[in-house]
């Protein structure tokens, strides 16, 4: 999909071959599913935080790609012998193969009875990072715009649909004329 991002009076400049970084937000469905799985309300403010769990999971934390800390925690606490053996082996490729296509919710659900405190959970997650995309335009022709060509990442695994964080943020969540956080 072709996107045109207006630079307005930002003063941002670019050259051929540069990239632009976009700060996405997480999908509402996944955010709500994790909040439900944690057993708290959307407006819960976890101990040690100023924002609600909904804001934290939407804007601040990576909930698509499970962190090493989360995987180790689940392996230790879930009672899943296969995952525990895999993590104990420290075989990075085998762990990558195991977690391929899985998100944070999938790991939380390895043992549906596993309770995770909200503050502990957030400590196991990584910060939501910007995503960089190659610019497909030239300032010589478009001095107030950045053009991007982005393919939306989507897949289905078992009964769930999965979405890339930023590619589908651009495709589904940013309205024409809407604002983005970029650098």
Regions found by a protein language model. Give the residues of each.
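FNR-like FAD-binding dehydrogenase module
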Residues: 1-183
């Amino acid at each position: 999909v072709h996107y045109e991002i207006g630079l307005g009076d930002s003063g941002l400049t670019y050259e051929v071959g540069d990239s632009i970084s976009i700060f996405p937000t997480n999908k509402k469905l996944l955010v709500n599913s994790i909040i439900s799985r944690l057993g708290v309300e959307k407006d819960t403010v976890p101990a040690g935080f100023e924002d609600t769990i909904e804001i934290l999971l939407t804007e601040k934390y990576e909930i698509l790609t499970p962190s090493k800390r989360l995987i180790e925690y689940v392996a230790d606490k879930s009672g899943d012998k296969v995952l525990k053996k895999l993590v104990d082996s420290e075989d990075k490729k085998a762990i990558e193969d195991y977690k391929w296509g899985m998100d944070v919710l999938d790991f939380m659900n390895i043992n549906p009875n596993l309770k995770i405190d909200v503050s502990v959970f957030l400590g196991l997650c990584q910060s939501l990072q910007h995503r960089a995309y190659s610019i497909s335009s030239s300032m010589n022709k478009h001095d107030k715009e950045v053009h991007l060509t982005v393919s939306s990442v989507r897949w289905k695994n078992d009964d769930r649909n999965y979405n890339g964080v930023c590619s589908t943020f651009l495709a589904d969540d940013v309205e024409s004329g809407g604002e983005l956080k970029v650098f």
